[in-house]
A protein has these predicted regions:
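Short strand-coil-strand connectors
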Residues: 180-182, 202, 405-409
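Acidic-aromatic substrate-binding/catalytic surfaces of carbohydrate-active enzymes
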Residues: 182-299, 317
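Active-site and substrate-binding clefts of carbohydrate-active enzymes
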Residues: 1-85, 102, 106-177, 184-186, ...
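Hydrophobic, well-ordered secondary-structure elements that form the walls
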Residues: 114, 183, 346, 458
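Beta-strand-rich recognition/accessory modules
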Residues: 168, 283-330, 338-345, 351-352, ...
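Polysaccharide-binding surfaces and accessory modules of carbohydrate-active proteins
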Residues: 340-341, 349-422
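A cross-taxon signal for low-complexity, glycine/charged-rich
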Residues: 86, 91, 96-97, 104-105
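Short beta-strand micro-motifs enriched in acidic
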Residues: 189-191, 334-338
Length: 479
């Protein structure tokens, strides 16, 4: 017979529950552990110090939550596709290890991609790189995009097509927007500046906004302290969870800068004249506007021919040292079902009864899977800058076009502006813990085209930009 009744609590092994804690809580938890370990009651108290819960990772890292919810969306999409499991159009095949899979039905093939996207390492971070490793995130997104494309190619037999969904995508209780075409998948977070948090280029199965926000980790203090810990012969064998990573790279503390907003695209900034490339790149500048991480209103207009116009608008303020000035920002995005470039129209209007001067710009954070030369580089107005690599810092004036290109995977992104811009560019690096020590990881490149604004009472300022994504053979070099 049973010895008794027991209900097991949710949990995992000790280290996992510690890693899942938010930064401040983990610092306090580690301090409490160190204090209690010196007391006689340690052995009796240890079982009650549980730390966090695995799903805290989805709160701690919005990038993990986004990926997790994308995975759930694909699962629902597969289940709602229908029981017939229609095969995709003729000529569509799914490549695996160099061989075409047999046509077993769309649902089964998409479900296989779903399962591949669920490989757990990419959804969290502990002593290994996990979520901080871009190639792991890329692999998960690749399978998600591939699975979605299988469903969509069968659901939409006639091209071109455009569809959108307005729903709570990230589980925060607020509505977001997803717009898709045969070529693109666009994911907007309305309550975070109507920012574009994911751009899927579906022909190459890649998310181009595969970037991590720089945020503090409890182990960063060891880097600042220059702490090295080599095992003593008398300490005995340690598990991998007990080992202290060795700081084997000099200067990692120079990359410990933290962001106060999530790195994405179409982030709208207002700056003062004292802001510069270095302070902006280190996120140590003064933000004058209240648009970057605040809510925008949305209006969707369906055009003839299956086209969409997405209109995001916010009335906010520029917080000058002398006081606030009301201002509105409207960004209209025109989306077509074919492979035409995205067209973005900005309108900034001063709502104040007096003239104002400021700097306005929109930030892009993009990752073309690597920073290293010679395959990955910038072109600015048709020519490579002095230091063109993705990992470079640079400032250029009078810019009408900037191209990011990765020849290794055959993809480019082109931004065009109808008003010449000043362009800042810099890499995003994080410092994370791995089994081999602390390491600097390239997470993407940030571009910030911006303009000097002088607005009179009720005056409007307008900008038109194009965002083109494709493969070099398509249109790179055409003007």
């Amino acid at each position: 017979p049973a010895l008794g009744r027991i209900y097991l609590p949710t949990g995992s092994y000790e280290e996992m529950m510690e890693w899942a804690l938010p930064y401040d809580a983990r610092v306090d938890y580690e301090a409490a552990l160190e204090r209690i370990k010196g007391l006689e009651l340690w052995e009796r108290a240890a079982s009650f110090l549980k730390g966090g819960f695995w799903r805290n990772f989805l709160v701690k890292y919005p990038e993990s939550n986004h990926l997790h919810k994308r995975m759930l969306q694909l699962s629902k999409k597969i289940e709602g596709f229908g029981e017939d499991g229609r095969d995709p159009p003729l000529g569509t095949s799914l490549q695996r290890e160099g061989c075409a899979l047999p046509a077993e039905g769309v649902r089964e093939r998409a479900r296989e991609e779903l399962y591949r996207s669920q490989c757990n390492d990419v959804y969290w971070h502990g002593i290994f790189g996990g979520l901080y490793l871009p190639h792991l995130r890329h692999a998960a997104y690749m399978h998600l995009i591939r699975g979605e494309s299988l469903i969509d190619s069968s659901s939409h037999r006639e091209a071109p097509w455009v569809e959108y969904r307005w729903e709570d995508l990230d589980g925060d209780g607020l509505h977001d927007l997803v717009a898709t075409t045969p070529c693109l998948g666009l994911f907007f977070d309305l309550d975070q500046g109507a920012s574009l948090v994911e751009i899927d280029y579906r022909p190459r199965e890649i998310n181009l906004v595969n970037t991590m926000t720089r945020r503090p980790e409890a182990y960063h203090s060891k880097i600042r302290e220059g702490k090295r810990k080599n095992p003593s012969p008398t300490e005995g064998v340690k598990t991998i969870h007990e080992m202290e990573p060795v700081q084997d790279q000099v200067g990692l503390e120079d990359f410990l800068y933290y962001d106060w907003y999530r790195r994405a695209c179409l982030l709208d900034h207002f700056l003062g004249a004292d802001a510069g490339l270095v302070s902006f790149g280190r996120c140590q500048y003064a933000e004058w506007g209240d648009f970057v991480n605040q809510k925008y209103d949305l209006k969707v207009e369906e055009k003839r021919g299956g086209e969409l116009q997405l209109i995001f608008r916010r009335e906010g303020h520029i917080w000058f040292p002398s006081g606030p000035a009301p201002v509105s920002v409207e960004k209209k995005i025109h989306l077509r079902g074919d492979s035409a470039p995205l067209v973005v129209h900005y309108c900034v209007q001063g709502l104040q009864p007096f003239a104002i001067q400021t700097i306005f710009g929109t930030e892009f954070n993009l990752n073309l899977l690597g920073e290293s030369p010679p395959e990955r580089y910038y072109e600015i107005d048709g020519a490579r800058p002095e230091n063109p690599w993705m990992g470079s810092w640079g400032e250029s004036s009078g810019v009408e076009e900037v191209v990011l290109k990765n020849e290794a995977i055959g993809i480019f992104i082109r931004l065009r502006f109808d008003l010449p811009a000043k362009l800042w560019r810099f890499p995003i690096y994080t410092v994370s813990q791995s089994e081999s020590g602390f390491e600097k990881v390239y997470q993407g490149s940030s571009l910030f085209p911006h303009w000097d604004l002088s607005l009179g009472p009720r005056e409007k300022w307008n900008l038109r930009m194009q965002i083109e994504i494709g493969e070099p053979k398509d249109s790179l070099g055409k003007r």
